[in-house]
Amino acid sequence: MKALKVLIVGAGIGGLTHALCLSRAGHRVTVLEANPRAEFLGAGVQISPNATKVLQAIGLEPGLSQRATQPENSIFRHWRTGATIHYAPLGSAVKERFGAPYYHLLRSDLMALLTNAIAKDSRIDVVYGAKVVAFEAGDDAVFVDSLDGQFMGQVLVGADGIHSIIRQGLLGEQLPRFTGQVAWRFLVPTASLDARAFSPAVTAWWGPGQHFVHYVVGQGQWMNCVCVLEASQWAEESWVQPGEITDVLADFRDWHPSLRALIEAADVPDIYKWALFDRPELPRWGAGPVTLLGDACHATLPFLAQGAAMAIEDAAVLSRCLSEGADIPGSLKRYEDLRKSRTTYVQRASQRNGWVYHARPPLTWLRDLITPWAGQRTMTRLYDYNAL
């Protein structure tokens, strides 16, 4: 297909990756972002080989290898005893097997790499402060209205997250569902930790009704911590509730001493508990010249560490479909057909992992027995994928 003018709503990981993929295929892109400036929020993010391949293809490998950490292995531990339930090599083993590294890095570092690459790309414009309120698709063009003006393109991609205004325009308003789980997220300076107790691995501690994951980010300067607990309801008006480290210690009061030492080493003025929400699977992702990408169409729980990876895969596949297709609606339909079964699998597998991580006796013995087999099977299905 000849060079297109594509509008992308949302300057997150998925939207910016898609812009770079499109530019490298010769298309012109305008990214509309509601925030008045680039914001590099969030703590750690895991980039598995299936996503790394895409980021390498758009020229980010030098920055990734400089800013990111490659975990040596993945370890699952018993919440109270610290005994190893399962161990899987990552590092060089994953790179050799799947053709690309497994990276841990700060979300802000990944966003900086994407933003810097876009700043050097003459085919991409990013408009900050462009809060989209509506869109209209015609036969030959799509018109997007923001509070500050109107934009026109041939294709519209909603990469605007779980609260997507583009999804709402396509399918009507759908309220997100509280999953019955909440997460503490915070960073701990590694300088305050005993290096012997915390190796460069991604470690998940499994306990009844809750789990704790930690891994190194920020070129080894920080330990990213994510602690998930079950909750019967979320009564707060906001999705985010402020708290203190003492609250986290209370939630994990009977856990292994080394894990509690990790929590106690946190040196943060603010800590927040996040409610985990998802949405029902969508009947379709688009119509005509309009489609969705990432959390806008398949919001995913964090229990497979594949949320960012799915958006990155979407970005590459959608760019390829638009470049190879004969017409825009057909290209977008092909993209949806290629992606929907995989993202649905990841959504459902992530939900299942929440149950697995939080299993209670007597089911824990069965979980621990089948985890090595099931883990290898899942790893192959996820990391073997090639979106390019």
Residue ranges and their predicted role:
Residues K2-V6, S23, S48-P189, S232-D251, ...:
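Conserved N-terminal helical subregion
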Residues R196-A197, P208-Q210, G218-W222, C227-L304, ...:
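FAD/FMN-dependent oxidoreductases across multiple families
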Residues V9-R24, R28-N35, V157-G158, W184, ...:
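Conserved mid-domain beta->alpha element of the FAD-binding
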Residues A38-E39, I165-I166, A299-L301:
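Catalytic P-loop NTPase motifs of RecA-like helicase/translocase cores
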Residues K5, R28, W222-C225:
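Residues at the starts of beta-strands that form the adenosine-phosphate
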Residues A137-G138, Y215-V217:
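Short beta-strand micro-motifs enriched in acidic
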